[in-house]
Amino acid sequence: MKDKIILVGCHGTGISTTVKALEILGKKVWKKPVDPKSGLFDKSNKKLESKFAPYDVFAGLPFSNHYKNFKDIFDDKCKIILTVRDPLDWYSEILSANKSKNEHILEQVFSDMEALKKSQKKKKAIQNYMDHNMEVIDFFAEKDEDILILEYGKHNKWKRICDFLGVDVPEDKYPKMKDDFKKSIFSLKSPLLF
């Protein structure tokens, strides 16, 4: 079975760009909606391996919330890429990407924010973002060869990704997807695709 690559960063951290880079490397990306409550991520689901077998890359929600299940099911065949950026820059990017939907999107990602007053949401969103990143890093503390942390805006991403995956660096320039991120993520109708 091929390695499974799970991108577990929050949106606004370079996930779309990283997906494009992985596609340039010939990786097949899952692009279908998934209901996280469907039981698809349950280890006892007999269809799981066959359903995911043709794909190499799984990005964003709900996959980023089920990386532990993937690691448990695919074990040594599962690699994690955590995309990160400065927390304040991340929050600003989410807000600037689409002001009319930002609150709704943050509440989808972090359900415990719904009841908060507007003044509390920024602090809570940033704390949730940092907690998510630390949880991922802590989970892989003993198997750090299975995780790559890519910081938004840093150079040498091709080399870091290719070294991590054990493939040659392509001649293509590393993609830039910021505008595509804003168009694609915030125009989705279904939260299951986000």
What is the predicted role of each segment?
Residues 23-27, 43-46, 51-52, 68-167:
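PAPS-dependent sulfotransferase catalytic domain
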Residues 11, 61-66, 154-155:
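Short beta->alpha connector loops
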Residues 54, 66-67, 90, 132:
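Amphipathic alpha-helical interface surfaces
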Residues 1-55, 61, 182-188:
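PAPS-dependent sulfotransferase catalytic core
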Residues 33-43, 87, 137-194:
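The conserved 3'-phosphoadenosine-5'-phosphosulfate
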